[in-house]
Amino acid sequence: MESELFQGGVLMHSYLRAVGFSKITKRSSIEQIIMDVVETYDKKIVIEDHPDGVFAEFSKNYGCDCGITVCGQYDENNVFYPDYYFPFFRGTGITTQESVVIERHAEKESFAGACDDLRIGVTLIFYLQNAAEYLQESRKSGMLPGGQPLTLSGLAKEGKILFPVEKDKEAVKAARELTKNRNHLIAAARNGDEEAMESLTMDDMDTYSMISQRIVTDDILSIVDSYFMPYGIECDQYSVMGEILDFMTFKNIITGEEICQLTLDCNDIQFDVCINKNDMLGEPKIGRRFKGIIWLQGQLHY
């Protein structure tokens, strides 16, 4: 198999550092890594009946469940031309089984996904990791059902470790009940229930009043336990803060840079985040909180 590099060179990806390539600053260096992925891949999927030719996706791990994916096309002479690449981190477990909508990006054969989860309160938009697998399945069965299991994960360029908010068991139990009731109200409101809408409005007003009073004397991070909200103008980037349920560290097999994998509970959603240890301020421990900006990725399971 032959391969050619990107026409006009290759751009640096801003989240390469999250998977242990923080010192990659030259295009020639990332081109070598891309060639390494194509030639010594861990996983390869080829779509031969693609409208534009033969589409191929190569993935290689450079750490624990994290690495680089390269996508492109073969020409009639079996020469592979990379179109784009991206760093990935595959999370653990199933984050949600809500209905997911997938749409192709305009400029290349990559995809974005959108999912409404009542626990977050906003539409989650993520970058689809397994584009080739999605293309395979959609060609097999036409329109895919909307309830595919979804695993979300995040790559972080920077983050901080915060102390936890002190809570007693009764307060935790009461908060879970309130969250459960609120999710039922949101579901009802989406179906046009006016009483549910009014109840949610009153709850929001009470919350605003409570925060307005406490913000005078308390720090905002002691009032807000966790959050998950859009960040900047790129639709798949989020500012998150959540409790650390588990963590582990490992090294990039090429650079030796230490990477930290954190399992977070954020607004009752559990997902994993990957960050270069040099970009994280503080020492992670179970029960503490992580606060940072993430690029949200998702993997659909078939």
Give, region by region, the residue ranges found by the protein language model.
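Short nucleic-acid-contacting surface segments enriched for D/E, G, S/T with interspersed K/R
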Residues: K277-G292
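N-terminal ordered "arm"
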Residues: E4-Y85
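Long, hydrophobic alpha/beta structural blocks
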Residues: D49-G232
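Short amphipathic beta-strand/extended segments with alternating polar/hydrophobic composition
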Residues: L124-F126, D272-K277
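Short coil-to-beta-strand transition motifs
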Residues: Y231-E243, R288
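OB-fold (S1/OB) nucleic-acid-binding surfaces
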Residues: L245-V273
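Short, Lys/Arg- and Gly-enriched loop/turn segments at beta-strand edges
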Residues: W295-Y302
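Eukaryotic intrinsically disordered and solvent-exposed regulatory patches
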Residues: M229, M248-F250, N278
